[in-house]
């Protein structure tokens, strides 16, 4: 489940209107994937806020498969997730996570919360029995991953760090041939020909949507599966 832009409005939250839909989605995923040995953990969703509906999803999944642990990025009280899930932590936050130190929310975190990642405060006692997973890190946009090795070093340094998931694997674009037979990979509003516009009015930000920006094109490989330059850095680190 991901509700991203409307999760602040309690969707799905604890609203009973959404309970049946999100539980059904969870059940269907478990039934589809529970016999695949590569699936080592169930995820209740991503960027969808918090609320009792996620506990209902977990209960439904456990009824079908009680052999796996659970992950949920939006679990603020860690009653649903078996891991501490974070997005895009800075170097100092990585050190606090590795040393199991309390984390408070800064002004920067509050701004980030309005855009995407849910930066959660963490009390020292919440680390007990909960390893740390970066559900998104190393945002692979343009000429990126310059400090990728620093994350790898921290994964190796701290025993409570499981690792993380690079955002993301492949450019999110659709293959279309133009009238001359040339290959094109389209995303955003390429199909409507709209001009890009500011996503949110925060000074010095580049959060944009539209046809001439590249927020969907941030994979370590292209939509045609050809490697981007930063995949060399990933290979070196891993």
Q: Where do the language-model regions lie?
A:
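Substrate-binding/catalytic cleft of secreted carbohydrate-active enzymes
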Residues: 1-216
